[in-house]
Amino acid sequence: MAVEALSSAPRVKVAPWNDPVIRGWVFQIVVVGAVGFLAWYLVSNTVENLARQKIASGFHYLEREAGFEIGDTMVAYSPASTYARAIYVGLLNTLKVSVLGVFLATILGTMIGVGRLSPNWLLAKICAWYVEAFRNVPLLLWLFLFYKLISEAFPGPRQAIGAFWNSVYLSNRGLYFPVPLADPIHKWMGIALLLGIAGAWALQRWARQRQDATGQPFPAISAGFGLALGLPLLVWLSGGAPHHLSWPELKGFNFEGGTVIQPEFTALLAGLVLYTSAFIAEIVRSGILALHKGQSEAAMALGLSRGQAMRLVLLPQALRVIVPPMTSQYLNIVKNSSLAIAIGYPDLVASINVTINQTGQAIENILLIMAAYLSVSLSISAFMNWYNKRIALRER
């Protein structure tokens, strides 16, 4: 009876401004409207000011001739190429130094991090001094130092240091060495290399499953390297083993022919790797220390050596702690590569900086830089998040 009385009681009407649902919708509409108005005002005001100053807008300039040289290119480029091509070349240079930096910094940082935990007092102290020295000095200063050392320590092209029967030359202009001339077989060698890498990955998975099932190890690393390198070698031999090379030769004041690793690239890569590896070393060390001490004791009790315990027991478990903060370091390598402009390496920022100076269209070019770095960073984050989920513990 009391329930019927409660259900039949008239509902109290609430004013619209006191209804939290209606109030929430109103606030959201007001905020979205204010943001939209602000965006419209900024865009319209910018377009009007650009028109008043007779500065073109839009991305049509990308189809015009660039008219400037780029010293280090991975693809064909000349001053007659378009601005779009020049920006593409700069992006490839950024990706090249970033990928190599991530790979080398991971290896070096892992070695330094493990070295800090070594029972060898001298090795542990050297690794600790390395970490403290590199991570407490700004990266830009390291880049200046490495570039100055490379440009001042080595002789000029006429006094270049020759090696390997004068086929390789080292000077303050870079490291010159011979490269194979273009041949159709190289395309098939590249395909064979990709197939070999895929086969090595499948072999590694099979070896791991076999060891889990039988306890018998399989030399998957050496076999994988043999497969990845053996397939391209077989393709090269089956294609007649073409060995025509372009050799570096001193002509005038510099070398021509072959290829060169420029000092700007070397200084940038060395700075990124040594600086970032100091942070990665601390991440690796903290990840290993986060494990229970009983893990290492159990590994030793099974008869494993210290190296085997680290490789087979400790590091695989520490990955769950190491991977999340490593994402930030990989992103830092990509973003810090923009400091290349300080030592003259033609990366994405340098190419777009020249484009801005010649076209005057700063807004569009800055948007291109932001879009490029955002795309690369999101791709790295997505991959690392996927890998982190893959190695996470799964509860039953």
Feature map (PLM): residue ranges:
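Transmembrane alpha-helices and adjacent helix-loop boundaries
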Residues: 2-396
